């Protein structure tokens, strides 16, 4: 599939992975209200790779995710953006349909005789086995995000985009969700681009951490820390300090 909107060329399908990249972005420009939100941005994500994206508010993180997901066709832009057609998106708000039970939320849009079985398996994977008939209102915020993850991964996407998916959760629930998300991604192996404001979250989850500044990728470094990634290790502290310094935040112990 190919589309050209305002000078931005987007391609998808099998060609997206011919060069062993799931996402490839070259010289991407996005203009909103006369301001260049993304300015000559370049980024590549390999199959199964987990990339976290940091940056100040207004740096263009959500704009980048929307561009990759092709959710903003009316925005002026240019450059090359290659991504697969089968993309799932997880938002900070779980966005469950309140009038549908959990299983119905998960299998929404799925087809085939095994759709319900796949939905049940997906709910079991996120620790909600036996809750298929529950209503979204009966769940905590963390449980609702578990359903959102199940709904995204039941489709076995090549690419998972996540826009601050745990931003509204308490600290303990966030830690539990980090563990769950890593386990799910290791099992399903999508490429992942996750936006966050939390440096510790970025380090905990990522194979690579990138920082977006003034519409460009200013930092893109691998996270070469073995699990579990503990705050007290010198390697963790050095990486955390480096990222915080680039973001203009003084490190605290």
Residue spans of the language-model regions?
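Catalytic Walker B motif of ABC-type/P-loop ATPase nucleotide-binding domains
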Residues: 160-163
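A short, proline-enriched helix->beta-strand linker immediately N-terminal to the Walker B motif
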Residues: 154-158
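Conserved ABC ATPase signature
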Residues: 135-139, 143
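The feature captures the beta-strand-to-loop junction immediately N-terminal to the Walker
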Residues: 54-56
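Helix-to-loop junction immediately C-terminal to a conserved catalytic motif
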Residues: 69
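Hydrophobic anchor residue at the start of the ABC signature
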Residues: 149
């Amino acid at each position: 599939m190919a589309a050209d909107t305002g000078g931005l060329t987007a391609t998808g399908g099998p060609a997206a992975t011919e060069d062993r990249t799931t996402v490839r972005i070259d010289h991407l420009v996005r203009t909103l209200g006369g301001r260049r939100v993304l300015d000559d941005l370049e980024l590549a994500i390999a199959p199964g790779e987990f990339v976290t994206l940091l940056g100040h508010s207004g740096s263009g993180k959500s704009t980048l995710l929307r561009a990759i997901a092709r959710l903003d066709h009316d925005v002026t832009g240019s450059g090359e953006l290659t991504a697969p057609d089968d993309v799932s998106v997880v938002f900070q708000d779980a966005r469950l349909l309140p009038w549908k039970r959990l299983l119905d939320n998960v299998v929404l849009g799925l087809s085939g005789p095994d759709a319900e079985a796949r939905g049940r398996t997906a709910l079991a994977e996120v620790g909600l086995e036996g809750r298929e008939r529950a209503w979204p209102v009966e769940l905590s915020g963390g449980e609702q995000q578990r359903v959102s993850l199940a709904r995204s991964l039941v489709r076995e996407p090549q690419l998972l985009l996540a826009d601050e998916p745990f931003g509204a959760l308490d600290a303990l629930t966030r830690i539990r969700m980090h563990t769950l998300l890593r386990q799910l991604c290791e099992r399903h192996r999508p490429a992942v681009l996750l936006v966050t404001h939390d440096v510790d979250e970025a380090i905990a989850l990522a194979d690579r951490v990138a920082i977006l500044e003034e519409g460009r990728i200013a930092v893109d470094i691998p996270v070469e820390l073995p699990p579990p990634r503990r705050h007290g290790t010198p390697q963790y502290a050095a990486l955390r300090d480096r990222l915080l310094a680039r973001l203009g935040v003084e490190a605290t112990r």
